Amino acid sequence: MDILKKSLFIVLFLGLVSLSICEEEKRENEDEEEQEDDEQSEEKRGLWKSLLKNVGVAAGKAALNAVTDMVNQGEQ
């Protein structure tokens, strides 16, 4: 009976150790995925920022051209 108890204890202990290792690996994988998501979000923000900047520059140039045309028409 004593041998059976020791064997059962060893099996349970090894099961808990392997479960703990699996949980740790799972947490590491989740952390890596979260970091990848953060990097992708930063890339998207950078793309939106450059897109909005380019749109702003284009709108500014268009407005400047419109004002210049109005001034030129007023001089004629």
From Swiss-Prot:
Primary site of residence: secreted
GO cellular component entries: extracellular region
Keyword set, alphabetical order: Amidation, Amphibian defense peptide, Antimicrobial, Cleavage on pair of basic residues, Secreted, Signal
InterPro entries: Dermaseptin_dom, Frog_antimicrobial_propeptide, FSAP
One BP term from GO: defense response
Family per record: Belongs to the frog skin active peptide (FSAP) family. Dermaseptin subfamily.
Name recorded for this polypeptide: Dermaseptin-H1
Top-level taxonomy: Eukaryota, Metazoa, Chordata, Craniata, Vertebrata
